[in-house]
């Protein structure tokens, strides 16, 4: 049974005697809202859920206001998968396919010759971008390698996505040595071994407190108040109109003529339709 109180929540916690920190997140309505306007194949849905969980876990490590974008770019059946999340745990995502996808396809087959790009964008400050090879079987393993190479922080990511009680769900754990250098490799490996025993039904069905007790009942764990996670697209008539105005006047006129005097622009993330006739476009130009 799913405990509703911990749906769409992110928890941070600290192992008091080990100098290791952790995070747990579960996406229920957030994941469903993301999928509502799309008919992705099962393997793409699950990968999208994994990427959303990873983005939530990474944004929770930010020490500043801003957002993180994680995207897969490839030349396989999956051309693009993009997730954007903010420090306030608002998230949006989309995928673009360019070929048919079968159920037992591997990540490397799905993406082809692809890369994972992480863009960290502070509200105030310079953007940072890292490019990661998709040379591991899972997104979680690729991101673990990223933390070791870019931040020299031993990190474990356990991410699962699928269905529970007939509904889409994605969840995950992050375990990381404290960046102040006080944590030991031995402590981290001990906790990582315990975390690796987690089952899907535990990630998908237990409360954070119950899950952490199940995994770490002999440890002293301080759990901090949770953050709510939600799907938030951010699209609007004005933003869609700004994109439309990048097209030349002649081309806009041709499109209006071809489509009976109204241009329909649909948001890729949430599926909302925005309609522009000649009068609306003239107002946007004013």
Curated annotation (Swiss-Prot):
One of its GO terms (cellular component) is cytoplasm. Disulfide bonds join 233-235, 267-270. The keyword Cytoplasm applies. Redox regulated molecular chaperone. Protects both thermally unfolding and oxidatively damaged proteins from irreversible aggregation. Plays an important role in the bacterial defense system toward oxidative stress. GO terms for biological process: protein refolding. Under oxidizing conditions two disulfide bonds are formed involving the reactive cysteines. Under reducing conditions zinc is bound to the reactive cysteines and the protein is inactive. Keywords: Chaperone, Cytoplasm, Disulfide bond, Redox-active center, Zinc. This is 33 kDa chaperonin. It holds the Pfam family HSP33. Belongs to the HSP33 family. The keyword Repressor does not apply. SUPFAM superfamilies: Hsp33 domain, HSP33 redox switch-like. Its main location: cytoplasm. It comes from Histophilus somni (strain 2336) (Haemophilus somnus). NCBIfam families: PRK00114.1 (NF001033). It comes from the Bacteria. It is found in: Cytoplasm. One of its GO terms (molecular function) is unfolded protein binding.
């Amino acid at each position: 049974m799913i405990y509703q109180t911990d749906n769409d929540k992110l928890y941070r916690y600290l192992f008091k005697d080990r100098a290791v920190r952790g995070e747990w997140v579960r996406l229920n309505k957030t994941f469903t809202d993301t999928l509502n306007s799309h008919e992705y194949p099962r393997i793409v849905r699950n990968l999208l859920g994994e990427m959303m969980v990873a983005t939530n876990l990474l944004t929770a490590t930010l020490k500043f206001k801003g957002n993180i974008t994680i995207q897969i770019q490839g030349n396989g059946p999956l051309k693009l998968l993009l997730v954007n999340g903010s420090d306030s745990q608002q998230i949006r995502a989309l995928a673009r396919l360019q070929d048919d996808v079968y159920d037992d396809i591997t990540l490397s087959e799905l993406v082809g010759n692809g890369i994972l790009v992480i863009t960290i964008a502070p509200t105030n400050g310079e953007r940072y971008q890292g490019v990661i090879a998709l040379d591991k079987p899972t997104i979680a393993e690729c991101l673990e390698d990223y933390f070791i190479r870019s931040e020299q922080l031993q990190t474990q990511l356990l991410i699962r996505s699928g269905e529970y009680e007939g509904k889409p769900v994605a969840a995950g754990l992050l375990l990381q040595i404290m960046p102040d250098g006080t944590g030991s490799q031995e402590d981290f490996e001990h906790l990582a071994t315990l975390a690796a025993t987690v089952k899907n039904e535990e990630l998908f069905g237990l409360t954070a407190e119950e899950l952490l007790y199940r995994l770490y009942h002999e440890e002293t764990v301080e759990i901090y108040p949770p953050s709510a996670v939600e799907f938030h697209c951010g699209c609007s008539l004005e933003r869609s109109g700004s994109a439309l105005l990048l097209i030349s006047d002649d081309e806009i006129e041709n499109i209006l003529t071809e489509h009976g005097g109204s241009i329909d622009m649909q948001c890729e993330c949430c599926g909302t339709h925005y309609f522009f006739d000649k009068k609306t476009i003239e107002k946007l130009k004013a």
